[in-house]
């Protein structure tokens, strides 16, 4: 099983430690993982801003870069969801599209494909779990509160394999943090207020850390928190916790 590691542009530039942790975690599990060089953006920012034509060349390059792999794994639910859902439409009649069936968020991959069931790293801290919208409603990482289904949470399942951790959840656990990509730019006041309310609910759990599978949500909440002078809680990606102490 050959795995191609996709590191989204914002992770590469702003949170490279998340990419390193993801690679480290996959290698620790004995997997054949490769990081293809000269990766680029998946095209999501352009497409979400209404410039889908400009996103197509990036989608084509992504396809060419990752077509040889059995799975493409990324530490980003939003980019993973964009590729999975939108590439077939963007590339229809223009370019072969195979990666939409291969790409998975790292949580989804470890839980559903590798089926990790043994202890991972060590992280003796209280963490509050943030369930990102794309992860809940497009990738199925956890059960959405608006649907009457048996509750499940793949992120929590993996975190509970970490030694010493205490996983907490805020009130209204799958409510949006307010980031939403372009939404945070076009509706800054609303986005900021949503982020602040979300951070406050996370802090109310008594957690030392706020964690989640998407660095964009964590980036937004961290920015809002720091602007308000909130420094008594830290922000960390799920992959970093799973890889801690390995």
Residues covered by each model-derived region:
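Iron-sulfur cluster-binding electron-transfer modules in prokaryotic oxidoreductases
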Residues: 1-246
């Amino acid at each position: 099983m050959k795995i191609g590691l996709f590191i989204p542009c914002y992770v590469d530039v702003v949170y490279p430690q998340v990419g390193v942790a993801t690679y480290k975690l996959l290698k620790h599990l004995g997997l054949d993982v490769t990081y293809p060089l000269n990766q680029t953006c998946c095209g999501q920012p352009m497409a979400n801003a209404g410039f889908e034509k400009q996103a197509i060349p990036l989608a084509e390059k992504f396809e060419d870069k990752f077509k040889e792999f059995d799975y493409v794994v990324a530490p980003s639910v939003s980019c993973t969801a964009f590729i999975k859902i939108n590439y077939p439409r963007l590339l229809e009649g223009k370019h072969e599209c195979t990666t939409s069936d291969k790409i998975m968020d790292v949580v989804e991959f470890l839980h559903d494909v590798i089926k990790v069931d043994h202890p991972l790293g060590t992280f003796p801290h209280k963490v509050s779990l943030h369930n990102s919208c794309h992860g809940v409603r497009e990738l199925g990482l956890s059960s959405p509160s608006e649907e009457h289904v048996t509750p499940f949470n793949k992120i929590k399942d993996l975190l509970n394999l970490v030694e010493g951790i205490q996983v907490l959840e805020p009130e209204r656990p799958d409510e949006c943090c307010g980031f939403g990509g372009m939404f945070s730019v076009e509706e800054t006041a609303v986005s900021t207020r949503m982020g602040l309310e979300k951070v406050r609910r996370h802090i109310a759990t008594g957690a030392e850390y706020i964690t989640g599978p998407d660095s964009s949500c964590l980036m937004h909440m961290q920015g809002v928190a720091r602007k308000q002078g909130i420094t008594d809680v830290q922000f960390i990606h799920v992959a970093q916790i799973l890889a801690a102490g390995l």
